């Protein structure tokens, strides 16, 4: 025993404790180890020289005292006292070395010494009696623990790496609307970089050996510390516990562990080999009861592990940063999750509440970036596995309410969690679980209530995520998912709760998010420890049925956001694939429409979805047709990737399964599907086969068609697949290698002899012959030429076969010789015979005198059609007689001519009918085909075209037969390509057919005009544009939809300014307003005006539909310019007096104000909320885009506000006064526009009116009265629904209730109010005895404007005072309530009193409102009510009878009887110079002349 003590004393003596100054020791303790004076350099050098050995020896000797039983051994503290060794000196010395390691410049020896010193300090604490001897000091303890981390050398580039490798947390900075911090100045940044470089230069270099020694020292000291923890209680030292937790957590990622760490209490520290293992063991030891009762330590531990799980670095709030996702980071996260699970299993019930809180905080603090969000959701689900069923159900209930929080990112995260939960097996219910919680254990609940309810979320990202989750669940074919969706589709009680509050009460503040229907984000405060996050449910329950589910899916397939549409398609297809509902035409139509979606990704998804659905249900003919209709036209897609996808799907289903007929099996579903699809292409869907030509052309470039493929096809030509096999052969023959022509020629020989051969098959065979003509021997070609010619001359085939036959004949002749002259000679010989045969038969029919013989119409049609086809190949063989014969067939009958002459006498026709042959009475079928033939002849004979084109245009007007009008349209449009200048003047005649009574003609005209406009054979001249866009309101919705497609996808792309150039004139044209000097000045007949007129209130909705459609496809620049143009070129004309303000202008102005108030005219940056959906965006660029969008919106908003204030407000305010003055109902729409604008530009409007407070007060008063009027109307509409008589009454502003004729429109309709003001006996409405004179001074700014008394109380007072003071004469104005009830309009009198002075004196026009022209006694105006000049006030009709002249001249000025008597009115004397300056200032802001 004595030897051991002697050795210890020897080791202590080598530490030089006796040489330490007592003053230095005392200062170290007094300063609480925070600051120290430098140690005597001699003593430090002496210890450092043999420091490692000294500290190791001391550690070894002290360890014996720590490990022995204190009862059986002598106390070391007694030994210190007996030998006069000051323990404070030893502790102070150790602290000096521990402190030295904190310096970045510390070398390897200093760091190792620091670790050894920290180990010695831990050993001193481990020795019994250390607390009583006051060895423990919290600061030194924390520094010793800190040494475990600080002694490890930091990477010299760590500071620079941190900036690159960490990402700013999207949820960390929750400062709401505060300004962003000022970026560092460039010079400051450069200085910081220089200082960092200097520090880097001063960094000490560590060799590998040094690093190994330091690592080993850390490992040994950490083991010593872990030996201390079970013995040394930290229960009273919570800050030290917290510090230990943080250091241990940092050490868990100190080095990589090759295998999965076993977390177990049974594992000995001595068996651990890695620092992270020791660190986790240390965390486990800190959770023991010795260091704290309850779950406080666990709570602190979980809070610190939260950042590891979320892969974040730094503290919470604005200081947090995201770690780059890497294998070490993911490994640390996984270890933390496993350790938490270990703790929960070990500590049981005590940790469950804390785990529940941790789960809640994961939901609230996850990084809002796609990858991090997924990892956080997976971590949450793994931790949820540790919850018992009861707690699991409670948390799911919390999560359900959380999923409806107002923050978009929360709702998206809830969906991520649900997706991960659905991957786990469903939990089985316990007997002890309350019945109301059973639902929360079921996957069905997650699917129906948490996924499906979010499919209609107002945030696009949430909708997209929910639909994507739903699609994933169905794709996995899990029974629970399918059952859950099945219940939804069957309309079981699916309840959706809206309205959830999340409240988190902490010591520092509260996190609060109000309503799920308000996507607002509230600040999140930093919390000291984990606190429970409470979620309250305040919403109503809504149920949905199966029809609503399908309706929702179809609606979402047309959502404004690309990702939502794409996800909706996936869900819809998976629902159909799983046979949860039968395929309906509506569902398939939705999929077909998405094949033409504007977004590339949606088009690709639609192609994939349709193909998957067809493969899942290959026997459904409905799906087969939908697949063909949706997919085949996409081969013409302008986007190459979409085109390639379509070709891939076509190749997969149409080509790959074509094998030799010998290997064809009926039970092979893929082969059967291929031939079913090809058969449809030759029958019901044969119109789509023309698109296949493009596909086969593209495939031919890829050498898709081998000789084996051709052989396989030919093997099917004499089987039940004959028609589709020949159809495919006709497409591939032109690009395929040489074929076995024998089989093809034999088929032609056989088919040509059959009288009942299939038309399509015959045409395809002839097409194949044309393709292989150049490969045939010369004698075979000669034989075929004669054969085809003879076959045509028999005239037994229908027109559908004649065209391919003539084309084959042409190709055979071209292949026969190489010289063009010889080819034409051959064609003249061959085709000349056919022309002669046609001429002979047509002549015999036309010239026949016998009327009794029945006409063989089919035969004549065949001759006419053949003539038109072959005449184009040999124009020299077509004689004038042939032309006259065709014209004679087309000559109109006498009856038709006479009718047409009287049909439109006032508008002489621009063209004359064919008049050479009168009395021709050919059937419509013959005439229809004859027009086609004539058109083909005109293509080769220009003189004939000059003669026939006017007659063709006239035929469109007079002919009633649909087939004839259709063919004439086709002929005129084809001739327009050949003779553009000649036909151009007759394009208006063709465009009239857009209003044809037959839908087929309207659509055909639309197609033909679109083709001409695309190729620019026709320009947008005259009324063509306005007639074209009128198709948007076609009564047939299919035609209207097709018109939208033509305008947007075909024409607007070629001419992006097309809509903006014609927009203003659209307003004039559709309102039939022709008084403007520039707009709507093209020539039209009365019939054309009537056909295309959209004038009147009954067509208001149609006009607005056109306007809004055009505006939706404007660019922002075009929208911005349009507002200014409307103000300067239209509204200013009314203000300047260039255009009269009358009832004819009412609808025009009403449309303009509705357009200017519409959301479509607002700039896109102003309509959308920047960043409203960025919170959950998967794209890193989304955040940057949101910032750009916000800056763009701010800039555009400033420019738009400036434009509004400088260019629009002056004109609008001036025009408002004029409209009120003339009682034009459009003033109501103006007020609505002002109300909309004042919401956006209230401050700017106040600034503008700062110089004219009178005008500002009047405008504010008017707006107030207008809003009161709207409220009254809404209340009356609820209480008393409007009758048929009152619904037609135009509503004006508070000042413009009665609309009457103005002097500029004497024939304008009277106000509907005058109709209501009739006597019960039906007397005619009263009219004013004089017409008020209107003086519009050109170039003058807005005059002082007049206000009406629109308050019902004042009106009642007026009536009462009128009975008492009939003979009193003064100035006033009578007014009515804006929306009189039927009872009131029939029982009260409308009285307008005027004095003689008012009727004659026009000098009062410019008088200020506050200056009386005569003395007023005992009467005054109500507060805020202006005077309205007599010469500007129209008279209202007076109900009752047309009374005496004296009664009508009675005048009364009144005020409310209960008002106090007014003070005598003062004169408002104002300098004319001042008044002139004010007017000039106002007019200077309003350029009232049209700008060019």
Swiss-Prot record:
| Gene Ontology BP term (one) | mitotic chromosome condensation
Q: What is its main location?
A: nucleus
Bias kind Polar residues: ranges: 1277-1290
What job does this protein perform? Answer: Regulatory subunit of the condensin-2 complex, a complex which establishes mitotic chromosome architecture and is involved in physical rigidity of the chromatid axis.
Keyword flag Cell division: yes
From the UniProt entry, list the residue stretches annotated as the region Disordered. 152-201, 1269-1345, 1359-1406, 1454-1492
Identify the stretches annotated as HEAT repeats: 543-581, 583-619, 621-659
Q: How does it assemble?
A: Component of the condensin-2 complex, which contains the smc2 and smc4 heterodimer, and three non SMC subunits, ncapg2, ncaph2 and ncapd3 that probably regulate the complex.
Gene3D superfamilies documented for this protein: Leucine-rich Repeat Variant
Picking any one GO molecular function of the record gives: histone binding
Instruction: Please give the name of this protein.
Output: Condensin-2 complex subunit D3-L
Biased-composition ranges, Acidic residues, are: 189-201
- Report the subcellular localization: Nucleus
- What domain of life does the UniProt record list for this protein's source? Eukaryota
Q: Which GO terms describe its cellular component?
A: condensed chromosome, centromeric region; condensin complex; nucleus
């Amino acid at each position: 025993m004595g030897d051991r003590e002697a050795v210890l004393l020897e080791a202590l003596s080598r530490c030089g404790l006796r040489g330490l100054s007592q003053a230095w020791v005392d200062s170290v303790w007094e300063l609480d180890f925070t600051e120290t004076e430098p140690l005597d350099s001699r003593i430090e050098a002496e210890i450092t020289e043999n420091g490692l050995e000294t500290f190791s020896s001391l550690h070894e000797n002290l360890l014996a005292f720590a490990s022995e039983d204190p009862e059986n051994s002598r106390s070391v503290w007694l030994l210190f006292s007996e030998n006069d060794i000051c323990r404070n000196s030893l502790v102070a010395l150790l602290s000096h070395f521990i402190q030295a390691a904190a310096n970045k410049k510390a070398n390897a020896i200093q760091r190792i010494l620091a670790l050894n010193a920290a180990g010695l300090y831990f050993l001193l604490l481990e020795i019994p009696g250390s607390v009583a001897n006051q060895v423990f000091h919290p600061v030194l303890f924390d520094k010793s623990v800190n040494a475990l981390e600080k002694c490890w050398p930091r990477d010299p580039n760590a500071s620079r790496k941190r900036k690159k490798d960490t990402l700013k947390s999207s949820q960390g900075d929750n400062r709401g609307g505060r300004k962003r911090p000022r970026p560092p100045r460039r010079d400051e940044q450069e200085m910081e970089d220089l200082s960092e470089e200097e520090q880097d230069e001063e960094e000490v270099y560590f060799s590998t050996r040094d690093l190994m020694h330091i690592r080993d020292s850390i490992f040994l000291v950490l083991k010593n510390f872990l030996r201390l923890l079970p013995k040394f209680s930290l229960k009273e030292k919570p800050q030290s516990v917290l510090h230990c937790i943080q250091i241990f957590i940092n050490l868990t990622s100190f080095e990589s562990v090759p295998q999965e760490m076993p977390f177990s209490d049974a594992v000995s520290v001595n068996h651990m080999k890695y620092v992270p293992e020791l660190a986790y063991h240390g965390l486990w030891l800190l959770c023991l009861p010795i260091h704290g009762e309850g779950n406080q330590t666990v709570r602190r531990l979980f809070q610190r592990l939260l950042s590891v799980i979320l892969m974040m670095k730094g503290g919470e709030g604005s200081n947090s940063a995201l770690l780059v996702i890497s294998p070490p980071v993911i490994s640390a996260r996984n270890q933390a999750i496993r350790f938490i699970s270990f703790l929960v299993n070990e500590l049981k019930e005590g940790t469950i509440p804390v785990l529940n809180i941790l789960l809640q905080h994961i939901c609230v603090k996850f990084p809002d970036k796609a990858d991090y969000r997924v990892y956080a959701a997976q971590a949450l689900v793994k931790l949820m596995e540790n919850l018992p069923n009861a707690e699991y159900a409670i948390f799911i209930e919390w999560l359900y309410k959380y999923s409806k929080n107002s923050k978009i990112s929360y709702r998206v995260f809830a969906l991520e969690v649900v997706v991960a939960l659905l991957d786990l097996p469903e939990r089985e219910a316990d007997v002890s679980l309350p019945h109301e919680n059973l639902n929360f254990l079921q996957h069905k609940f997650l699917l129906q209530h948490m996924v499906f309810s979010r499919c209609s979320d107002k945030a696009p990202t949430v909708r997209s995520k929910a639909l994507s989750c739903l699609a994933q669940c169905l794709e996995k074919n899990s029974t629970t998912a399918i059952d859950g969706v099945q219940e939804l589709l069957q309309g079981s009680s699916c309840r959706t709760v809206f309205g959830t509050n999340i409240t988190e009460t902490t010591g520092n503040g509260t996190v609060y998010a109000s309503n799920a229907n308000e996507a607002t984000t509230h600040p999140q405060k930093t919390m000291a420890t984990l606190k429970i996050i409470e979620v309250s449910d305040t919403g109503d329950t809504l149920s949905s049925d199966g029809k609503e589910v399908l309706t929702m899916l179809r609606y979402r397939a047309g959502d404004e956001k690309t990702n939502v549409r794409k996800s909706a398609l996936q869900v819809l297809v998976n629902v159909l694939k799983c046979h949860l509902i039968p395929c309906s035409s509506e569902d398939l139509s939705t999929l077909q429409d998405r094949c033409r979606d504007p977004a590339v990704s949606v088009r690709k998804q639609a192609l994939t979805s349709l193909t998957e659905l067809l493969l899942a249900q290959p026997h459904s003919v409905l799906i087969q047709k939908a697949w063909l209709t949706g997919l085949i036209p996409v081969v013409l897609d302008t986007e190459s990737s979409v085109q390639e996808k379509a070709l891939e799907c076509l190749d997969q289903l149409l080509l790959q399964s074509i094998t030799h007929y010998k290997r064809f099996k009926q039970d092979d579903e893929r082969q059967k599907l291929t031939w079913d699809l090809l058969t449809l292409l030759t029958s019901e869907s044969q119109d789509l086969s023309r698109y296949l030509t493009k596909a086969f052309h593209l495939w031919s470039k890829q050498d898709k068609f081998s000789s084996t493929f051709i052989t396989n096809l030919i093997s099917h030509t004499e089987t039940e697949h004959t028609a589709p096999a020949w159809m495919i052969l006709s497409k591939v023959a032109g690009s395929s290698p040489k074929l076995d022509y024998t089989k093809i020629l034999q088929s032609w020989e056989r088919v040509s002899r059959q009288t009942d051969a299939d038309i399509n098959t015959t045409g395809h065979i002839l097409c194949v012959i044309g393709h292989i003509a150049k490969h045939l021997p010369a004698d075979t070609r000669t034989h075929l030429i004669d054969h085809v010619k003879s076959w045509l001359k028999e005239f037994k085939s229908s027109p559908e076969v004649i065209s391919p036959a003539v084309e084959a004949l042409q190709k055979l002749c071209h292949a026969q010789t190489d010289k063009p002259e010889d080819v034409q000679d051959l064609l003249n010989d061959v085709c000349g015979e056919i022309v002669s045969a046609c001429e002979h038969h047509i002549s015999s029919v036309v010239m026949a005198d016998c009327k009794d013989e029945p006409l063989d119409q089919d035969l004549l049609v065949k001759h006419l059609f053949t003539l038109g086809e072959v005449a184009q190949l040999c124009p020299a063989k077509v004689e004038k007689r042939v032309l006259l014969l065709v014209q004679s067939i087309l000559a109109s009958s006498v009856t038709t001519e006479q009718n047409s002459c009287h049909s439109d006498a006032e508008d002489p026709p621009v063209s004359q009918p064919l008049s050479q042959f009168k009395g021709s009475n050919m059937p419509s079928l013959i005439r229809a085909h004859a027009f086609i033939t004539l058109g083909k002849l005109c293509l080769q004979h220009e003189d004939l075209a000059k003669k026939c084109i006017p007659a063709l245009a006239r035929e469109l007007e007079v002919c009633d037969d649909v087939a004839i009008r259709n063919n004439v349209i086709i002929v005129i449009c084809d001739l327009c390509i050949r003779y553009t200048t000649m036909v151009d003047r007759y394009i208006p005649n063709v465009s009239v057919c857009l209003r044809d009574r037959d839908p087929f003609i309207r659509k055909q005209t639309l197609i033909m005009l679109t083709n001409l406009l695309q190729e620019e054979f026709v320009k947008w001249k005259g009324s063509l544009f306005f007639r074209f866009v009128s198709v948007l309101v076609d009564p047939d919705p299919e035609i209207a939809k097709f018109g939208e497609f033509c305008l947007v996808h075909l024409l607007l792309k070629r001419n992006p300014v097309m809509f903006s150039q014609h927009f203003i004139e659209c307003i004039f044209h559709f309102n039939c307003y022709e008084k403007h000097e520039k707009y709507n000045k093209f020539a039209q007949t009365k019939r054309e005006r009537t056909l295309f007129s959209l004038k009147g209130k009954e067509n208001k909705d149609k006009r607005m539909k056109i306007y809004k459609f055009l505006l939706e496809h404007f660019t922002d620049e075009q929208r911005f310019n349009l507002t200014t143009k409307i103000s300067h070129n239209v509204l200013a004309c009314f203000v300047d007096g260039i255009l009269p303000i009358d009832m004819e202008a009412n609808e025009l102005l009403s449309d303009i104000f509705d357009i200017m108030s519409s959301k479509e005219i607002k700039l896109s940056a102003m309509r959308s909320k920047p960043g409203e959906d960025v919170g959950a965006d998967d794209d890193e660029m989304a955040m940057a885009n949101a910032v750009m969008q916000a800056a763009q919106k701010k800039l555009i908003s400033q420019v738009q506000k400036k434009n509004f204030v400088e260019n629009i407000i002056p004109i609008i305010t001036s025009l408002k006064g004029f409209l009120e003055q003339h009682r034009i109902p459009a003033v109501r729409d103006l007020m609505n526009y002002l109300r909309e604008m004042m919401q956006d530009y209230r401050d700017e409007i106040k600034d503008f009116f700062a110089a004219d407070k009178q005008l500002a007060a009047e405008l504010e008063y008017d707006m107030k009265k207008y809003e009161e009027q709207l409220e009254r109307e809404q209340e009356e509409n609820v209480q008393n629904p409007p009758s048929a008589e009152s619904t037609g009454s135009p509503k004006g502003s508070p000042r413009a209730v009665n609309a009457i004729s103005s002097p500029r429109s004497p024939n304008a309709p009277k106000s509907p109010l005058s109709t209501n003001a009739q006597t019960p006996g039906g007397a005619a409405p009263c009219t004013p005895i004089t017409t008020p004179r209107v003086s519009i001074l050109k170039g003058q700014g807005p005059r002082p404007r007049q206000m009406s008394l629109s308050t019902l109380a004042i009106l009642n007072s007026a009536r009462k005072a009128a009975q008492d003071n009939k003979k009193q004469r003064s100035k006033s104005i009578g007014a009515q309530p804006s929306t009189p009830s039927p009872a009131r309009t029939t029982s009260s009198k409308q009285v307008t009193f005027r004095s003689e002075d008012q009727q004659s004196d026009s000098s009062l026009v410019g008088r200020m409102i506050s200056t009386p022209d005569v003395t007023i006694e005992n009467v005054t105006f109500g507060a805020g009510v202006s005077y309205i000049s007599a010469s500007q006030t129209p008279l209202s009709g007076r109900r009752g009878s047309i009374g005496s002249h004296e009664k009508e001249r009675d005048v009364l000025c009144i005020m409310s009887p209960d008002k106090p008597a007014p003070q005598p009115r003062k004169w408002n004397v104002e300098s004319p110079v001042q008044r002139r300056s004010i007017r000039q200032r106002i007019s200077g802001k309003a350029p009232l002349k049209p700008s060019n």
